[in-house]
Amino acid sequence: MMKNGVVVITGASSGIGKSTAEYLSKKGFTVYALARRMDKLEDLIPLGIKPLFLDVTNETSIKVAIQEIYETEGRIDVLFNNAGYGLYGPIEDVDLKDARDQFEVNLFGLANMIKHVLPIMRNQGSGKIINTSSIGGKVASLLGGWYHASKFALEGFSDSLRIELKQFGIQVVLIQPGLIKTEFMQRTYDYASKIDAQSPYQDTIAHVMKSAERDYLTGKVGSNPIVVAKVVYKAIKARRPKTRYRMGKLSFIALTARKILPDKWLDYILLKR
C-alpha cells in the first residue's frame, strides 16, 4: 500500500498509542501523536513525531488539530483512534455522569474524530480508520458493565461504518487487544477502589481488587504494547486488511470461550477468576 503515509494517533501519551507512534515513525511514516498530556509527548519529538494537543470530548480541539494536520500535510492516510479508558465498578454504584463520560471518550469522541477526517479521506479516494476495541468488546467481565457497553457499541458502530465507507475506498479496521501492560488497569483499579464502602457489592469489589493486585498491577499478566503496534502496522500495510485483529494475552482464549461456551458457563468462569 502506502510507503510513507500520514498517520494520526489519538491517546498517544502512553501505552499502545505511544508505542505505535514510535514504531510507525521508525517505519518511515509521518506520525502525529495527539493527547491531552502534552508533557508525555515531549520525548517523541527527537524521533520526528509531531505532538499535538487533543481532547477528544471537545469539538473545537478536534477541529483545530485536524485542520492543522491537513494544512501542513495536505492529506491524512490513517486515523488510529486509540484514546480511551476503562470505568470499572458495579453498574448500580457508578454515577451516570461518569458512565456518560466513558461513552464520550470511548465512542462519541472517536466518532467525532472520524466525522472530521472523513471529508479529507473521501476527497483522496483512500484512507484507513483503525479503532481500538478490546476483547472487552466481545466478552463482558465482572464490574465492567459501562466499559463493556462502550466497547460493544464501538464494535457495532465500526461494522456499520465499514460498510458505509467501502464505496469511497476507505477501510475500517478493529483491533481487539487482550491484556496489555499499560496504565489502563491502574485507572480502572483507582475508580473501583473509591466506590462507597457501604455498597452491597463490597465483597465483589474486594474479589476483583485482589485479582487486579495479584495479576495486573504487578505486571505479571499482560503483553508489551509493541505487539499492538506491530499489528497496526500490518493492518496499515495490508491491501485488504482483516476487519478485526486480535492480539495480546488471553485474547485468543477469551474470544474462543465466548464463541463455544454457553453464557452461564462463561459467567461461572468469570465469577471465579
Language-model features: where?
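Conserved glycine-rich cofactor-binding loop
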Residues: 13-14
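The beta1-alpha1 cofactor-binding region of Rossmann-like NAD(H)/NADP(H)-dependent oxidoreductases
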Residues: 54-64, 96
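A glycine-rich helix->loop->beta "capping" turn
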Residues: 68-81, 87
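Substrate-binding pocket helix/loop in short-chain dehydrogenase/reductase
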Residues: 90-91, 98-100
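Active-site helix of classical SDR
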Residues: 114, 150-153
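Residue(s) in the substrate-gating loop at a strand-loop-helix junction
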Residues: 134
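C-terminal beta-strand-loop-alpha-helix "lid" module of Rossmann-like NAD(P)-dependent dehydrogenases
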Residues: 166-216
